[in-house]
Amino acid sequence: VASHALNIFGDHSDVYACRQTGCAMLCESSVQEVMDLTPVAHCAALKGKIPFINFFDGFRTSHEIQKIETWDYEDLEDLVDKDAIKEFRAHALNPNHPCERGSAQNPDTFFQAREACNPYYDAMPAIVQEYMDKVNAKIGTNYKLFNYHGAEDAESVIIAMGSVCDTIDETIDYLLAQGKKVGVVKVRLYRPFCAQALVDAIPDTVKYINVLDRTKEPGSLGEPLYL
């Protein structure tokens, strides 16, 4: 239970509680996206050497009955980096080549060691996009770290994450037919958060940005996705 009550309808409090664990976080908004992007999370974790939380809305997505195009193991063959798998296994704990982890460090070295992981997080967005591009080339999709849907000259844009994005897509299409200049940005890679990729996804004409969060963080100036 992440808040005052248990909720199976896609509150994001539980996954937001993990955002400072150091895990990369990839979100899908539909059953088909779960099938398509789960390989991205696995492959990026191996190549980028960062653990992933691959998440989607409970019940709204996890229990949805929907026809999808499924993947076979053979479909993953050309996505997987075999060298990355070997390197991953080589770093596993093994009594034949022991190593020290979780040591006690004094102030002179603690934060130096803490900052040493920065290059891995800086590189991760490009790695995720690399594997998204491979998936796009394979099945004809257009997955990005942040996907935009709407008018090219939109003045008002919604930023959202999770199953609500599919509903927003349909609403945007309805409003576009009425001549409204609106759009939606769907967040896929939440951590590490790539600010430049978000800026690139938003049209230059935008005047208003509305961030829809599915959680409440009491005492904060804003909710996690907004911040």
PLM region descriptions:
Residues V1, L76-A84, Y208-L212:
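A glycine-rich helix N-cap at a beta->alpha junction
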Residues A2-A5, C18, D133-L227:
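Thiamine diphosphate
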Residues S3-I8, I65-Q66:
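Short, conserved acidic/polar surface loops in the N-terminal third of protein domains
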Residues L6-G58, K82:
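Conserved thiamine diphosphate
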Residues H12, E28-M35, A104-P107, R114, ...:
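Electropositive phosphate-/nucleotide-binding environments in soluble metabolic enzymes
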Residues D36-P39, E64-K67, D169-I172:
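A short secondary-structure junction signal
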Residues V40-H42, E69-T70, D200-P203:
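Short, surface-exposed amphipathic charged segments that create phosphate/polyanion-binding patches used
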Residues F52-N147:
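Conformationally flexible catalytic loops at phosphate/diphosphate-handling active centers
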